[in-house]
């Protein structure tokens, strides 16, 4: 039966007639219900409350007694009871309280069975018995007493199984709190009290294990916790004995590798690697590094194969080949070069129709600028403006290397100058085509032919003279012949067939870099191949980082940059050097490895070229008698190119007696750390287009550190040159002022020998230097002890007068000796 089917209990009365069940009980259904309960269902007795008993006459009770009770016999009851026991055994409950529940249920049924016999005999009793009421009360009380013995420690389950008692209409249920229906009669109802439930007992670890194991094995044997532990340990030993076979790998070993990294590469334990090292006589821990040869021996001893790589192989990821079908036409990159104030920036100003030159101090370009100009027909030209001052030779050289065409601007009224010649040499060394733009043709009294003749001297021959160089007279101010200049650029670009691969990872060159407060490191780059996008990770020299923002030459933020497009990017961890190559890499770890490798190379190179001091120099420096003086400097600038140009120009200043030592150079404002370094080393801080913050100024006043600001580079160089000149020892020069002839020697007691002399030329001064000559040979050089005219001590004696002379610490004088008098004059030296 199911839980949803409700069975109306029949009224139970006592009489002389035989008891019988009016509803048959299916033993198969009851057994199936208990089997479905499985091992996790429990037995509980459920009974429903009844109303109060009514009193009826004995004759009515006998007539209403159900005939089915009489037909029930003891064999049927026992058979069904055995079914209950079998179901309880199949439930595999290990809780003793549950077993006692079943036993008590059986005892209840036996007590009910014992009541069957008197009921059968009562059928023959006379219907007019007067003690019927008392008998019914006794039987009911006994039933209630038996019901109270039924335990309630039965946990709830979702699966319910019902069994109806064949005698008293009771319903037994697994999985839900127990309730029993007893003794419903037509005249009276006996209420059975509800059974008190106790808290369900918690299953222990062993109980759960036994339930699971019994389900699998089918046996009801209870296992102890100790046996469970032994079984688990046995399984563990079995797993250890079945260890997987060792895998031998191909291990990539660089020039230097850590012990822990080597163990990870081989998938070996660090302890095993350390043991192998100890066999080789090397004591090392997991954090120490070993060389490639030792690592190879360890890996070979452990059965692995080795692949040796060089440290420089980290840069192999930067090498890529472009397919011919991927190449696309790109815009030409044009570098404008020339002497100072010849109109390079004004030319770009005219081409861009913007006022670039107005914002430059002294009319001098201080750093490289990159611009992109779009012509009327839609074609574009990228211009790179380089400084013309001699200090920016390195920047001009870099500009020539990254360009396709060089425009050399020459002023028609000034002709060829020093930086013009240098620009020509840079262009020739780079092997790029040259266009000469003769600027300022709008000025009066100019001679273009004179400029062309000067170009011939430097092997720049125009097309009209049979050469291959295009010479175009222009006026940047009046915008004369600018269209011809643009046509010449596009013609040469078309002849060169300039192409680049816009697909794949981007690569290019750093044009300029700087640090800006609030924005961090800003780097101007020129994309030469591929497409640079936001969030790309790039490596430039020893700097690396993720591209956070890209801004074009018009100040607009863009998402990608194609070949020949100059952009300013933000996101590098430090300022790269102008001219460094940049590449896009896959991840930040790859970029970091390349940067660390390049930093090691730079450090080794710096150590190798450092000047070595001799032991004598060290002793002289320690004693303070060193002939070489030092001028320590700290240079801070707005852009990396300017700082590099300043450092290079200052180091070229010629001086054998003064060593210019640049302690630190960098991009950005002057900080307190710069002040601390300057104070510790007595250095001068040079700021080019940067200033010191409020805290740095306070520290400078307190520590009395010299800070000098400049905005034009040649003012800075002249000032440092003057400082170095002031540190040089002055030149001491002798100046002849007079001479005298010794005519007579006097010996005076307590004074010594006195030379009576006659001043023959010039003037004789007491504090001047003196030489004594005999036969035109200097026999003494010193000072006067006394100089008298008659008896008076005088400071000087002029030509034509007589005087008395005595020498300091020298008396070997004779008549006829000559006295020469001179002064020592100091002159300031210049670099």
UniProtKB/Swiss-Prot annotation:
Subcellular location: Cytoplasm
GO CC terms in record: cytoplasm
UniProt cross-references to Pfam families, sorted A to Z: EF-G_D2, GTP_EFTU, GTP_EFTU_D2, IF-2, IF2_N
Region (G2): 363-367
Alphabetically ordered keywords of this record: Cytoplasm, GTP-binding, Initiation factor, Nucleotide-binding, Protein biosynthesis
Molecular function GO labels: GTP binding; GTPase activity; guanosine tetraphosphate binding; translation initiation factor activity
Cited HAMAP family: IF_2_B
UniProt xrefs under PANTHER family: TR-TYPE G DOMAIN-CONTAINING PROTEIN (PTHR43381:SF5), TRANSLATION INITIATION FACTOR IF-2-RELATED (PTHR43381)
Protein name (Swiss-Prot/TrEMBL): Translation initiation factor IF-2
Lineage summary: Bacteria, Pseudomonadati, Pseudomonadota, Alphaproteobacteria, Rickettsiales
Gene designation: infB
């Amino acid at each position: 039966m199911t839980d949803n089917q409700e069975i109306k209990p029949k009224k139970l009365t006592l009489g002389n007639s035989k008891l019988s069940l009016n509803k048959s009980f299916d033993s198969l259904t009851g057994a199936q219900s208990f089997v479905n309960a499985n091992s996790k269902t429990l037995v509980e007795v459920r009974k429903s409350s009844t109303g109060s008993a009514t009193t009826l006459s004995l004759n009515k009770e006998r007539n209403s007694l159900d005939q089915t009770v009489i037909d029930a016999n003891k064999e049927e009851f026992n058979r069904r009871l055995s079914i209950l026991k079998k179901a309880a055994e199949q439930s595999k409950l290990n809780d003793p309280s549950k077993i006692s529940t079943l036993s008590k249920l059986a005892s209840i049924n036996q007590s009910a069975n014992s009541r069957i016999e008197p009921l059968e005999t009562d059928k023959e009793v006379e219907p007019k018995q007067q003690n019927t009421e008392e008998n019914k009360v006794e039987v009911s009380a006994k039933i209630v007493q038996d019901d109270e013995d039924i335990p309630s420690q039965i946990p709830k389950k979702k699966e319910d199984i019902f069994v109806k008692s064949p005698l008293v209409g009771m319903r037994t249920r697994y999985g839900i709190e127990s309730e029993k229906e007893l003794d419903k009669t037509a005249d009276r109802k006996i209420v059975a009290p509800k059974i008190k439930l106790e808290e369900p007992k918690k299953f222990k670890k062993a109980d759960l294990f036994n339930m699971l194991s019994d389900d699998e094995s089918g046996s009801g044997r209870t296992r102890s916790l100790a046996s469970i532990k032994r079984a688990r340990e046995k399984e563990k030993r079995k797993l250890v004995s079945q260890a997987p076979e060792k895998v031998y790998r191909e291990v990539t070993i660089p020039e230097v590798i850590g012990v822990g990294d080597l163990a990870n590469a081989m998938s070996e334990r660090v302890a095993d690697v350390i043991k192998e090292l100890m066999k080789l006589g090397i004591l090392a821990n997991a954090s120490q590094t070993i060389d490639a040869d030792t690592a190879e021996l360890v890996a070979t001893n452990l059965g692995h194969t080795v692949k040796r790589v060089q440290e420089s192989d980290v840069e192999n990821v930067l090498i890529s080949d472009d397919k011919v079908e991927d190449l696309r036409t790109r815009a030409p990159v044009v570098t404008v070069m020339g002497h100072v104030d010849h109109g390079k920036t004004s030319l770009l100003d005219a081409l861009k129709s913007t006022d670039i030159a107005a914002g430059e101090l002294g009319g001098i370009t201080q750093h490289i600028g990159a611009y992109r100009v779009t012509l009327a027909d839609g074609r574009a030209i990228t211009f790179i403006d380089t400084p013309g001052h001699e200090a920016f030779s390195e920047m001009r050289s870099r500009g020539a290397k990254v360009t396709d065409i060089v425009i050399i601007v020459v002023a028609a009224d000034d002709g060829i100058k020093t930086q013009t010649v240098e620009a020509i040499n840079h262009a020739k060394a780079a092997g790029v085509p040259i266009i000469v733009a003769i600027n300022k043709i709008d000025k009066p009294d100019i001679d273009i032919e004179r400029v062309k003749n000067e170009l011939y001297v430097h092997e720049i021959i125009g097309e009209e003279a049979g050469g291959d160089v295009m010479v175009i007279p222009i006026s940047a101010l009046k915008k004369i012949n600018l269209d011809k200049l643009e046509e010449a650029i596009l013609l040469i670009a078309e002849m060169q067939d300039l192409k680049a691969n816009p697909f794949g990872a981007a690569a290019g060159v750093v044009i300029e870099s700087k640090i800006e407060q609030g924005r961090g490191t800003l780097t101007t780059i020129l994309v030469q191949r591929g497409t640079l996008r936001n969030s790309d990770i790039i490596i430039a020299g020893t700097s690396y980082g993720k591209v956070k923002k890209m801004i074009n030459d018009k100040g607009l933020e863009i998402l990608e940059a194609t070949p020949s497009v100059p952009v300013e990017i933000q996101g590098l961890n430090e300022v790269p050097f102008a001219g460094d190559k940049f590449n896009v890499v896959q991840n930040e770890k790859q970029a970091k490895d390349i940067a660390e490798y390049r930093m090691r190379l730079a450090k080794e190179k710096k150590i190798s070229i450092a000047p070595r001091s001799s032991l004598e120099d060290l002793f002289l420096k320690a004693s303070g008698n060193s002939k070489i003086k030092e001028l320590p400097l700290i240079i801070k600038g707005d852009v990396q190119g300017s700082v590099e140009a300043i450092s290079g120009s200052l180091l070229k200043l010629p001086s054998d007696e003064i060593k210019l030592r640049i302690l630190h150079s960098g991009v950005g404002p002057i900080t307190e750390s710069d002040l601390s370094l300057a104070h510790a080393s007595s250095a001068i801080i040079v700021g080019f287009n940067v200033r010191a913050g409020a805290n740095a100024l306070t520290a400078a006043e307190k520590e009395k550190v010299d800070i000098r600001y400049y905005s034009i580079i040649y003012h800075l160089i002249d000032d440092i040159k003057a400082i170095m000149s002031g540190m040089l020892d002055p030149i001491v020069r002798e100046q002849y002022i007079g001479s005298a002839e010794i005519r007579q020697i006097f010996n005076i007691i307590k004074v010594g020998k006195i030379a009576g002399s006659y001043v023959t030329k010039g003037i004789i001064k007491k504090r001047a230097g003196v030489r004594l000559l005999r036969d035109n040979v200097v026999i003494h050089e010193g000072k006067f002890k006394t100089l008298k005219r008659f008896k008076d001590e005088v400071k000087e004696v002029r030509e034509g007068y007589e005087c008395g002379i005595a020498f300091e610490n020298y008396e070997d004088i004779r008549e006829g000796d000559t006295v020469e008098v001179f002064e020592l004059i100091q002159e300031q030296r210049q670099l």
